[in-house]
Amino acid sequence: VLIKPQFETGKKLGKSGIVVNPEDRTKAINDVLGFAYAHGIFATAITTVPDNFRNKNIEYLVHFVKRPGGKRIIRAVDSDFVKNL
């Protein structure tokens, strides 16, 4: 799944359309992770979209599965995790 924080942030997003605050990016990711988890879909990996495909906003690819089968489940991330991706 592609998470585009600029669409998850809502009215907090400035006129530039760029999500610059790591806390806002973290909330966007956690909102999607929480929604998926509540519906029995589990995140097992998160990474950023490579720079050459990025249009100024940092976007995230998340691997979701219905049955984790012993894989580590990611239920939430913190802003330090997001900054270091």
Residue locations for each model-derived region?
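Preference for bulky hydrophobic residues occupying beta-strand positions
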Residues: 1, 62-64
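S-adenosylmethionine
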Residues: 1-54
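A short, glycine/Asx- and small/polar-enriched loop/turn
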Residues: 54-60
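Flexible, glycine-/basic-rich loop-and-beta segments that form/coincide
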Residues: 58, 65-85
